[in-house]
Amino acid sequence: MKHPFSRFFSFGEKEQEETMEKQEKEEVRKIPVSKIVPNRFQPRTIFDEEKIEELALTIHTHGIIQPIVVRECEDGKFEIIAGERRWRAVQKLGWSEIPAIIKNLNDKETASVALIENLQREELTPIEEAMAYAKLLELHNLTQEALAQRLGKGQSTIANKLRLLKLPQEVQEALLHRTITERHARALIVLKDKEKQLKLLQEIIDKQLNVKQTEDRVLKMLEAANPKPKPKRKAFSKDMRIAVNTIRQSLTMVANSGVAVDSEEEEFEDYYQITIRIPKK
């Protein structure tokens, strides 16, 4: 069995075997809660306190079913690799110790495990997910297509999430706090102009616009910024002016002879029309 993150860490076969041997010898240890620190690479920036309370109640009733995973730091502390929600829950219960497995991972491996583990749980906000993808691309120097293959996701999914990081910080914060949805945010991307994006963001919040209403507002704002130019009429050529004036003079002569001539003139983009009506009687 291969290491679950070997595709990212680029372990060789020998290294994988050594890793598996170490894992087989790993034991669950009780570690003081006070000596544990959060993962500095944790993609989740907001923890739902209500859900932490629910988890604490479950742990109080059933105990810790799955130990947290940590790595030892130089200052005698232990940094969480996986299981921060469980650690926060036992703190609420007032536990002094928590069962943990200690792993020997470097910063790159620790960051990758934390990011991938959270992505697999599918509990991140769209902006946290986008940040996780961006960090994995940076850590492993991957293309979006390669990352998508390794995570088992579509390349368009990765690309759409990463576009959210181009939005103003205020919009990203709204996504983070779930004030707006990802589809609202995608509609704002189309505007490109930061001032307009923030103006519409406030309108979405104040008027509680749904996605369809937001998309309609974006369309109107784009149309207002880029009005369709009115078609320019072609100028009269010298020959055309002579022709029109000659017809007018002829009509005047006919009218002066006592014939009731009725005429209408109409200008079009490509031609000039003169309609002449002469009664039979």
UniProtKB/Swiss-Prot annotation:
Q: Cite a single GO MF annotation.
A: DNA binding
GO biological process annotation, one example: division septum assembly
The residue ranges marked as DNA-binding region are 145-164
Keyword presence, Ribonucleoprotein: no
- The positions making up the signal sequence are none
Compartments annotated for it: namely:
Cytoplasm, Nucleoid
Alphabetical UniProt keywords: Cell cycle, Cell division, Cytoplasm, DNA-binding, Septation
- Which Pfam families does the entry link to? HTH_ParB, ParBc
> Cellular component per GO?
chromosome; cytoplasm; nucleoid
Q: Which family does it belong to?
A: Belongs to the ParB family.
Sum up the protein's function in the record's words: Effects nucleoid occlusion by binding relatively nonspecifically to DNA and preventing the assembly of the division machinery in the vicinity of the nucleoid, especially under conditions that disturb the cell cycle. It helps to coordinate cell division and chromosome segregation by preventing the formation of the Z ring through the nucleoid, which would cause chromosome breakage.
Q: What protein name does the entry list?
A: Nucleoid occlusion protein
Which gene is annotated as encoding this protein in its UniProt record? Answer: noc
